[in-house]
C-alpha cells in the first residue's frame, strides 16, 4: 500500500464545533477500505463520548446555509 497518496493535512486533530452547537474531537483521518475515500474519525464531546464516528472529509469540510448565511459545517475551536 505504499503507492497511496498521503492523507490531506486538514482537518487537524482537535476540538471542533458543529454549526448546530455541539462540540466534537477530531481524532484523525482514515481511508475507507474499499474506496480509499478519506474520512474524518471523530467523537462527540457530549453524551456517549466512547463512540467513534466517521464522516467523509468533503462533507466535514463543506459549508452549509443556515438562515440564509453560509458557514462551515465544523469550526475548529481548539487543539484540545
Language model regions located:
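Mixed-charge, low-complexity intrinsically disordered regions
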Residues: 1-80
Amino acid at each position: 500500500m505504499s503507492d497511496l497518496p498521503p492523507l490531506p493535512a486538514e482537518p487537524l486533530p482537535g476540538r471542533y464545533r458543529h454549526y448546530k452547537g455541539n462540540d466534537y474531537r477530531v481524532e484523525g483521518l482514515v481511508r475507507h477500505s474499499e474506496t480509499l475515500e478519506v474520512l474524518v474519525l471523530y467523537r462527540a464531546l457530549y453524551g456517549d463520548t466512547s463512540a467513534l464516528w466517521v464522516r467523509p472529509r468533503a462533507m466535514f469540510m463543506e459549508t452549509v446555509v443556515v438562515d440564509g448565511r453560509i458557514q462551515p459545517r465544523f469550526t475548529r475551536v481548539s487543539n484540545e
